[in-house]
């Protein structure tokens, strides 16, 4: 079911069902979560039972559950994937997020399909094709700007989904093979080794060092807080938070932050609405800077910028909180701009390395002065000089608020009590317009104190604290002020609320798979390289069906044995270090975008620069020992080493 043109969907990540529930309570309109297998986060899977229990919880708030099945599949995995999709459909999930086009060739139920960010959707032509072959919602590449997003929105009827917060893959999603080339672990199969977070030395074409031992492929975190209104105007309707590995506190905090931001826009503009039901109240002040982040960037949404990288450290250093005045044997004295608390996480940067410690005890020694005793005193602290900057990456008191009940979400209900002395008629109508009527037979005489009786009825009917509802309006339409015992009224109200629960769940309509356009679309290319990630026969059949003539195998098939782009990225190190020919002026205008090198230990990667689309290609070669490994996902690859030994021929004699 596509998001209505005026409804905005806040889409939150969930590592598990418990986090998914909290995401919904903190304001998510939809949650994406891994199933028992084939999701692009290797250690974020959930059982069918957990998902089946999560679905009705979400649907009671009008929220949706999307399950990620967004790895590329080996032929051996197609049948298990087909069974899993059928099982997921039976649990009631709203949609699958997929990358592998082979899934569209399987015999699966009519479940709604969303195109994963791994599909690398950057062009109008590709977006329109995916919409026309049956995808209801498409996740655009993070690297797009507002004009590109708007053009795609105007050319397709698919709901536009866009990442607004969280970690950034330096490569175009689905176009990174460096992990598989170096370790055999495939990002396209949910097992990225995160080579982009390692330190590298950058050398020019003469071998001269441009930058030494910095995290040159590590990006700051995405933060589109300031661009939400512009993204809405460009056509984005699903606002996605990255983070299926993130903990409960992170998801609570970031979901609450964007819930408040979107609600403010909805209230201000009047022509927009949230995509699910209820109002959300938070019992803490959200802050994007108090949970994990590597610094913030809005990436390419407005224009290319030079400060998108987190080159010094891929770790979370938090917010500046003061400076170190003195370091003693077992403690340090600090001057701060904010109060400290026992349990705070503090750190300093020493030669670009984060030296962190937990404050076991803090003691105020003067105005804005504290003495801090760490749990363990890092030896490197003794290297720093007075007035060294101090950061806090764990605010203990703020975090404690998140470990408790930190949000409440309730759905509005209009209540009307009618009837007469022999029968009461109670009607509950939810904010979505679902209505139930419940009756209570008896003999209800007129009360001695009419005003008190009417107030008791109104107050009693509005007591919805143990439910997910709140009374938006209470109307009493009786022939007089009738006396109804509190015990009867409470039971009457509880039964009606249960009936409304059931009616709202019964009325929930989930979407279904979108039909293929007529006439059938044609894929915009006739030749697909390994970059298309075609890893199984069904995916080949899909692309052949839509006009592709020549299809190369996915990188994981080990047919690309030479040097190829193992990463394609919009991030450009020439631009970052003011070596871009497009930016050159005066005497250096003759610069050319000659290749450069990234060096990490024995690993040497060549950088080539394609200046027309403004991209950097990281060139590498798959290691020989990986070529000898079984193909990922194959039956052979799933056999344990002990089992493989059993298959060896027995020695004679």
Swiss-Prot record:
Role noted for this protein: Responsible for the formation of the 5-hydroxycytidine modification at the C2501 position (ho5C2501) of 23S rRNA. May be a Fe-S protein that catalyzes ho5C2501 formation using prephenate as a hydroxyl group donor.
A Pfam family hit: DUF3656
Keyword rRNA processing: yes
Quaternary structure, from the entry: Interacts with precursors of the 50S ribosomal subunit.
Listed result of changing residue 165 to A: No change in activity
GO terms of biological process kind: rRNA modification
Family: Belongs to the peptidase U32 family.
Mutagenesis or variant effect for residue 161 to A: Strong decrease in activity
Name the record gives this protein: 23S rRNA 5-hydroxycytidine C2501 synthase
Description of how activity is regulated: Iron-sulfur clusters and prephenate are required for ho5C2501 formation.
Effect the entry attributes to changing residue 176 to A: Loss of activity
PROSITE patterns with a match to the protein in the record: PEPTIDASE_U32
Observed effect of gene inactivation: Deletion of the gene results in complete loss of the ho5C2501 modification.
InterPro entries membership: Pept_U32_collagenase, Peptidase_U32, RNA/ubiquinone_mod_enzymes
Keyword rRNA processing included in the entry's annotation: yes
Keywords: rRNA processing
Organism of provenance: Escherichia coli (strain K12)
């Amino acid at each position: 079911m596509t998001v209505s043109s005026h409804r905005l969907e806040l889409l939150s990540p969930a590592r598990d069902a418990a986090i998914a529930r909290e995401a919904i309570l903190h304001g998510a309109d939809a949650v994406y979560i891994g199933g028992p297998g084939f999701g692009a986060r290797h250690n974020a899977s959930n059982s069918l039972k957990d998902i089946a229990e999560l679905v009705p919880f979400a649907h009671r708030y009008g929220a949706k559950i999307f399950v990620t099945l967004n790895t590329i599949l080996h032929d051996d995995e197609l049948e298990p994937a087909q069974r899993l999709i059928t099982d997921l459909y039976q649990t009631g999930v709203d949609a699958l997020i997929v990358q592998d086009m082979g899934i569209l060739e399987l015999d699966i139920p009519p479940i709604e399909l969303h195109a994963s960010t791994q599909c690398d959707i950057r062009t109008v032509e590709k977006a329109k094709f995916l919409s026309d072959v049956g995808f209801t919602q498409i996740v655009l590449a993070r690297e797009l700007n507002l004009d590109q997003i708007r053009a795609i929105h105007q050319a397709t009827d698919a709901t536009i989904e866009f990442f607004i917060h969280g970690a950034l893959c330096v490569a175009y999603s689905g176009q990174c093979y460096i992990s598989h080339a170096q370790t055999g672990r495939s990002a396209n199969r949910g097992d990225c080794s995160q080579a982009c977070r390692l330190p590298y030395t950058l050398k020019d074409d003469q071998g001269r060092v441009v930058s030494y031992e910095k995290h040159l492929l590590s990006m700051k975190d995405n933060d589109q807080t300031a661009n939400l209104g512009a993204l809405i105007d460009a056509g984005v309707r699903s606002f996605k938070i990255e983070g299926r590995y993130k903990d409960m506190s992170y998801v609570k905090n970031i979901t609450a932050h964007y819930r408040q931001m979107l609600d403010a826009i909805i209230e201000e503009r009047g022509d927009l609405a949230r995509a699910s039901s209820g109002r959300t109240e938070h019992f803490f002040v959200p802050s994007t800077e108090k949970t994990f982040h590597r610094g913030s960037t809005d990436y390419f949404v407005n224009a290319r910028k030079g400060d998108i990288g987190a080159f010094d450290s891929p770790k979370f250093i938090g917010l500046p909180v003061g400076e170190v005045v003195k370091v003693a044997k077992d403690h340090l004295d600090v001057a701060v701009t904010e109060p400290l608390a026992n349990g705070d996480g503090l750190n300093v940067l020493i030669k670009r390395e984060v030296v962190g410690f937990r404050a076991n005890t803090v003691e105020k020694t003067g105005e804005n002065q504290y003495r801090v005793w760490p749990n363990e005193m890092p030896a490197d602290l003794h290297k720093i000089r007075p007035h060294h900057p101090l950061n806090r990456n764990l605010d203990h008191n703020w975090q404690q608020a998140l470990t408790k009940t930190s949000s409440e979400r309730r759905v509005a209900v209009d209540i009307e009590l009618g009837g007469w002395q022999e029968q009461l008629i109670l009607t509950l109508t939810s904010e979505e317009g679902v209505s139930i009527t419940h009756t209570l037979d008896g003999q209800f005489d007129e009360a001695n104190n009419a005003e008190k009786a009417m107030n008791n009825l109104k107050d009693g009917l509005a007591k919805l604290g143990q439910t997910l509802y709140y009374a938006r309006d209470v109307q009493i339409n009786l022939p007089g002020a009738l006396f109804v015992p509190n015990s009867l009224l409470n039971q009457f109200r509880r039964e009606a609320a249960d009936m409304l629960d059931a009616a709202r769940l019964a009325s929930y309509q989930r979407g279904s798979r979108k039909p293929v356009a007529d006439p059938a679309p044609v894929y915009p290319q006739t030749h697909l390289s390994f970059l298309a990630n075609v890893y199984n026969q069904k995916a080949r059949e899909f692309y052949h069906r839509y006009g592709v003539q020549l299809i190369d195998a996915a990188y994981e098939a080990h047919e690309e044995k030479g040097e190829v782009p193992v990463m394609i990225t919009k991030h450009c190190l020439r631009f970052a270090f003011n070596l871009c020919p497009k930016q050159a002026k005066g005497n250096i205008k003759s610069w050319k975008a000659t290749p450069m090198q990234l060096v990490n230990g024995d690993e040497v990667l060549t950088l080539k620069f394609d200046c027309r689309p403004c991209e950097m290609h990281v060139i590498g070669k798959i290691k020989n020992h990986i070529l000898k490994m079984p193909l990922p996902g194959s039956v052979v690859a799933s056999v344990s080493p002990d089992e493989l030994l059993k298959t060896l021929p027995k020695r004679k004699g």
